[in-house]
C-alpha cells in the first residue's frame, strides 16, 4: 500500500488497516500531488516483485491516472462513470497483464470495480 502523507489520506489508511493487517504501508510525499504524470512516474518505478498495489492519493491525479491506464476500455460503463465523476473516498480497482510496472503507461488496464461512498 502506498499513500500520500496528507492527513485525509492517512486517515483513510487508518480506516482500512484492519482489512490489510499484514500489508506494508509506505507513506510517500510524492503522492501528495494533483498531477497524473507524477502519479504515472511513481507507478513506473514500483519494483516488479510487487504484483498488486493500492494507492491512496488525491484528485485530479487519481482520476486522470485511472483514465490514462484504462483508455482502451472504451465500452466500459465503469470507465464512463470514472470520466463523469470521481468523488472523494471513491475506490477503483484495475487489472492488467503487465509484467513490469515500468510498462504501465504502455499497456492498458481494465477497470474491475468503481465504488463511490454513496453506494456503501
Each model region followed by its residue ranges:
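A glycine-rich beta-strand to alpha-helix segment
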Residues: 52-70
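Short, solvent-exposed coil/turn elements at secondary-structure transition points
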Residues: 31-34, 97, 117
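Phosphate-coordination/substrate-recognition cap region in phosphate-metabolizing enzymes
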Residues: 1-51
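Domain-level recognition of soluble alpha/beta enzyme cores
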Residues: 73-112
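An N-terminal RHG(E/S)-centered segment typical of histidine phosphatases
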Residues: 49, 63, 101-120
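Active-site catalytic pocket residues across diverse enzymes, especially alpha/beta-hydrolases
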Residues: 17-20, 69-73
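Alpha-helix N-cap/helix-start capping motif
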Residues: 6-10, 59-60, 88
Amino acid at each position: 500500500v502506498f499513500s500520500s502523507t496528507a492527513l485525509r489520506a492517512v486517515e483513510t489508511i487508518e480506516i482500512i488497516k484492519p482489512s490489510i493487517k499484514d500489508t506494508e504501508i509506505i507513506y510517500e510525499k510524492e503522492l501528495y500531488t494533483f498531477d497524473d504524470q507524477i502519479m504515472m512516474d511513481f507507478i513506473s518505478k514500483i519494483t516488479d516483485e510487487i504484483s498488486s498495489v493500492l494507492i491512496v492519493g488525491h484528485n485530479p491525479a487519481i482520476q486522470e491516472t485511472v483514465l490514462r491506464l484504462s483508455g482502451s476500455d472504451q465500452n466500459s460503463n465503469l470507465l464512463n462513470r470514472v470520466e463523469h465523476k470521481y468523488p472523494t473516498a471513491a475506490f477503483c480497482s484495475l487489472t492488467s497483464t503487465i509484467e513490469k510496472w515500468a510498462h504501465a503507461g504502455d499497456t492498458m488496464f481494465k477497470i474491475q470495480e468503481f465504488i463511490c461512498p454513496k453506494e456503501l
